[in-house]
Amino acid sequence: MHNTSKIKTWVLITGASSGFGEEFARQYAKQGHALVLVARRLDRLQALAATLRQQHSVEVIVEQVDLSDVAAIVRLQERLRERGIAIDILINNAGHGLQGPFADAPLDAVLSMVQLDVASLTAITHVFAQDMRKRRRGKILLVASLLAYQGVENFAVYSAAKAYVLRLGEALHRELKQDGITVTALCPGMSDTGFAKAAQMKITPELRMLMMEPAPVVRAGIRALNAHHMSVVPGLANKLMAIFIWATPRWLHQAAVSRVMKAQ
């Protein structure tokens, strides 16, 4: 159903060229929202924008931005402000991971992941939260991970980064609530988004059984954001895993999760 409000609602989606970001764009376009799609791959963004305009008759703006550059995030905000665009919903989805022993990974690759998954996510949240606070309304969804609930062998930096995202979301949920802003952390498990290939992951049979399609994950995130929830874990199997992590000693759930994540 399209958004029939006379006031145009703008949704900014980072990492919109694939995976969860692309699916968020499709679902929000179907609802009739105007979109700002942000990613590095301009050709993918333009193709997606053309499809969404044709299918849903919505306004779509494409912004090719390297989000690892904080100055580029500030310039993005300035360009939108100059066009009179105020972001009502921020989907902070951009990020990447890398599987493997911590000490074997090139240092520049590790720091690049920290920059995008932590520093850049913080920067874009800060920039647009300031604008939302002035208007006393807005919604922010931070894409974390089920791995945020514990340190994970061979995903040391990624799981630590996503733990930061989850804790940031929990804190901001309470902090910005008084300003009329909802902040929700989405904690998906293994999903068929292309992330595994980009992270050079080997998919175990256990992981393949747990893998979700992007659409239900995104629907769960949007529902939780609209319901003003602090966080959400999509999918029954992922919820059970989160409960298992919460209810068992650290040594036990770390051993179990490592078994699931390791390629055999």
Q: Where in the sequence are the language-model features?
A:
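Conserved glycine-rich Rossmann-like NAD(P)H-binding loop of the short-chain dehydrogenase/reductase
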Residues: 31-48
